């Protein structure tokens, strides 16, 4: 039996920050990173809130938020006792906000509303029951899943993402595509998640290159913002897979941007998963739905067409190879493979991969990357 639950009220479109005017005479705690704390975007957020609110800011969030940061946030939340918490930023800020609120609730600290406002189009964290917390000492990322992690509200205002640099736009956009593809072939996929994942994938293929090349186009940014949320809805229900299980290790060990790590793995993982008939047919079906091959094409031809389009998309987005992305870390890559293999096997996202992957398979995939 499959279940499908959307617990976040979504507000989208240009000017949707205006919904924040509903909060009056509240203590509002904004969680963001240090860059956003000194960015005009924070002023935009402040100006969207009525003047009678008390506003506090926690700006200690770093890429791949750490256990230490979450503990620090819980302590500050206990001291401040806010009524509204706003996770403002990319996936790291939203993940940290969700984790801080969740763990605080378990300690008896409750709030009225948790709001997620993305300033990148990638993680879909604004509508998911997931967050990822890192342990830098061990070089491991821990994905957490719990229905209590759903934000109460999400605001998708494309005006907040027009200033995102091309490389970040590319990386986060490829994260969206990975979410959609992994949800699409998941054993827990359903008609409901298929609709979300297919639409998200189509939007990425159509709009990501323009978002990278002409980032000031609000309409294009809005399409990618929507794609991110659609894919987030899909994987929150259907799960992820091997791509994320390995990407978490590339990020934890080498601090690669998460979306880039996913992009570098994507076609390799597709070839691996296509080794089982169900996944092969699913990939082929998506390729045909996207118009990448004739309807009468066999599965192999359709999968090759999908892979070709992904590689072309990566080229349009000017994504580096793994060797280039690793920089000086390349010399340590082979030595770290055993640790990455074990951590990937323990990663919760592996549970919904369409093809079982043992240690040898993951090792071979990692070796193939270089």
Swiss-Prot record:
Observed phenotype of the null mutant: Loss of NADH-dependent reduction of propionaldehyde in BMCs. BMCs appear to be normal, cells grow more slowly on 1,2-PD with limiting or saturating CN-B12.
Catalysed reactions, as listed in the record: 1-propanol + NAD(+) = propanal + NADH + H(+)
EC code(s) of this entry: 1.1.-.-
InterPro entries the record matches: ADH_Fe/GldA (IPR001670), ADH_Fe_C (IPR056798), ADH_Fe_CS (IPR018211), Alcohol_dehydrogenase_Fe (IPR039697)
Cross-referenced SUPFAM superfamilies: Dehydroquinate synthase-like (SSF56796)
Protein name stated in the entry: 1-propanol dehydrogenase PduQ
Gene symbol of the encoding locus: pduQ
Function of the protein: An iron-dependent alcohol dehydrogenase required for optimal 1,2-propanediol (1,2-PD) degradation. NAD(+) and NADH are regenerated internally within the bacterial microcompartment (BMC) dedicated to 1,2-PD degradation by the PduP and PduQ enzymes, which reduce NAD(+) and oxidize NADH respectively, although there must also be cofactor transport across the BMC.
Alphabetical UniProt keywords: Bacterial microcompartment, Iron, NAD, Oxidoreductase
GO BP term, example: propanediol catabolic process
Record entry for activity regulation: Enzyme is oxygen sensitive.
Gene3D superfamilies assigned to the protein according to its UniProt record, in alphabetical order: 3.40.50.1970, Dehydroquinate synthase-like - alpha domain
Cofactor(s) named in the record: Fe cation
Lineage of the species this protein comes from: Bacteria, Pseudomonadati, Pseudomonadota, Gammaproteobacteria, Enterobacterales
Keyword flag Oxidoreductase: yes
GO cellular component: propanediol degradation polyhedral organelle
Pathway info: Polyol metabolism; 1,2-propanediol degradation
């Amino acid at each position: 039996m499959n279940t499908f639950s959307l617990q976040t009220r979504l507000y989208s479109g240009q000017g949707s920050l205006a919904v924040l005017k509903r909060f009056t005479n509240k203590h509002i705690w904004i969680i963001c990173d240090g860059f956003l704390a000194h960015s005009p975007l924070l002023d935009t957020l402040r100006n969207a809130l009525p003047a009678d609110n008390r506003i506090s800011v926690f700006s200690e969030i770093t890429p791949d938020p750490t256990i230490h940061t979450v503990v620090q946030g819980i302590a500050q939340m206990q001291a401040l006792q806010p009524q509204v918490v706003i996770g403002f930023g990319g996936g790291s800020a939203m993940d940290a906000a969700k984790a801080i609120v969740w763990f605080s609730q378990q300690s008896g600290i409750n709030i009225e509303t948790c709001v997620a406002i993305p300033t990148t189009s990638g993680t879909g964290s604004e509508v998911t029951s997931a967050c990822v917390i890192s342990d830098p000492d061990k070089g491991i990322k821990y994905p957490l899943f719990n229905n209590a992690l759903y934000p109460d509200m999400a605001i998708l205002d494309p005006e907040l993402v027009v200033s995102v640099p091309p490389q970040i736009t590319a990386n986060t956009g490829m994260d969206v595509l990975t979410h959609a593809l992994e949800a699409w072939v998941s054993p827990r996929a359903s008609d409901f998640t298929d609709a979300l994942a297919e639409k998200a994938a189509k939007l990425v293929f159509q709009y990501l290159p323009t978002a990278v090349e002409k980032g000031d186009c609000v309409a294009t940014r809005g399409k990618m913002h929507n794609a991110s949320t659609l894919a987030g809805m899909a994987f929150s229900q259907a799960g992820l897979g091997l791509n994320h299980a390995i990407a978490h290790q590339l990020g934890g060990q080498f601090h690669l941007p998460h979306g880039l790590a996913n992009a570098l793995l994507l076609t390799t993982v597709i070839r691996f998963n296509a080794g089982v008939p169900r996944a092969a047919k699913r990939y082929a079906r998506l390729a045909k739905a996207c118009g990448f091959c004739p309807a009468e094409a066999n599965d192999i031809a359709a999968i090759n067409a999908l892979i070709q389009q992904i590689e072309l998309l990566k080229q349009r987005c000017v994504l580096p190879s793994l060797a280039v992305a690793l920089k000086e870390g390349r010399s340590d890559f082979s030595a770290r493979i055993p640790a990455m293999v074990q951590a990937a096997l323990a990663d919760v996202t592996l549970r919904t991969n369409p093809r079982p992957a043992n240690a040898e398979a993951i090792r071979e995939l990692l070796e193939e990357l270089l």
